[in-house]
């Protein structure tokens, strides 16, 4: 809600140099720590190469499928009503859902046991594309929470 004129539109994410894909760039920006973008690119590209070797398919399609399967439609938001806090289910926009999916995929891959981040990320992406893994479980848990609190939907 801008107080002076119209609000600026959100910037559109740029695409990465090799795959020319915005989702890959979003993933790189999320995986980056302490401004080390070149290291983040290295991790992503190694993970993509490993997916290519493991599945013999285009790694971008595996990434898209994994994100599509992990993207939530609903989430719960805490809303305080007359002294008590209710978990109110809300619908999520596609961009916000994509961001959440990327965040969950990275969190799940960081939790995994394994040698390095590229190895763990590639394993998590392949599992998510198949419909299993920690990130999928997180999405299902979020949907269950939203379904359980459907009675509070009118507090939106």
Swiss-Prot record:
Q: Can you name this protein? A: Small ribosomal subunit protein uS7c
**Would the keyword rRNA-binding turn up in this protein's UniProt record?**
yes
Q: Which Gene3D superfamilies match?
A: Ribosomal protein S7 domain (1.10.455.10)
User: Which InterPro entries does the record associate with it?
Assistant: Ribosomal_uS7, Ribosomal_uS7_bac/org-type, Ribosomal_uS7_CS, Ribosomal_uS7_dom, Ribosomal_uS7_dom_sf
Give Gene Ontology CC terms: chloroplast; small ribosomal subunit
Functional note: One of the primary rRNA binding proteins, it binds directly to 16S rRNA where it nucleates assembly of the head domain of the 30S subunit.
NCBIfam families, alphabetized: rpsG_bact
Q: Which superkingdom is the protein from?
A: Eukaryota
The record's Pfam families line, in alphabetical order, gives:
Ribosomal_S7
Q: How does it assemble?
A: Part of the 30S ribosomal subunit.
Write out the annotated subcellular location: Plastid, Chloroplast
Tell me where it mainly resides. plastid
The record's family statement is:
Belongs to the universal ribosomal protein uS7 family.
Q: Which SUPFAM superfamilies match?
A: Ribosomal protein S7
What GO molecular function terms would the record report? rRNA binding; structural constituent of ribosome
GO biological process terms on file: translation
Q: Which UniProt keywords apply?
A: Chloroplast, Plastid, Ribonucleoprotein, Ribosomal protein, RNA-binding, rRNA-binding
């Amino acid at each position: 809600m801008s107080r002076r004129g119209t609000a600026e539109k959100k910037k559109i994410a740029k695409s990465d140099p090799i795959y020319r894909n915005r989702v890959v760039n979003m993933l790189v920006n999320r995986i980056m720590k302490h401004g080390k973008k070149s290291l983040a690119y290295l991790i992503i590209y190694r993970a993509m190469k490993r997916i290519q070797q493991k599945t013999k398919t285009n790694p971008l399609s595996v990434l898209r499928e994994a994100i599509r399967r992990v993207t939530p439609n609903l989430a719960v938001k805490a809303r305080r009503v007359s002294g008590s806090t209710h978990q109110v289910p809300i619908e999520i926009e596609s961009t916000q859902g994509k961001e959440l999916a990327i965040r969950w995929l990275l969190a799940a891959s960081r939790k995994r046991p394994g040698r390095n981040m590229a190895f763990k990320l590639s394993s998590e992406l392949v599992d998510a594309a198949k419909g299993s893994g920690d990130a999928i479980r997180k999405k299902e848990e979020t949907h269950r929470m939203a379904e359980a609190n459907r009675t509070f939907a009118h507090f939106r």
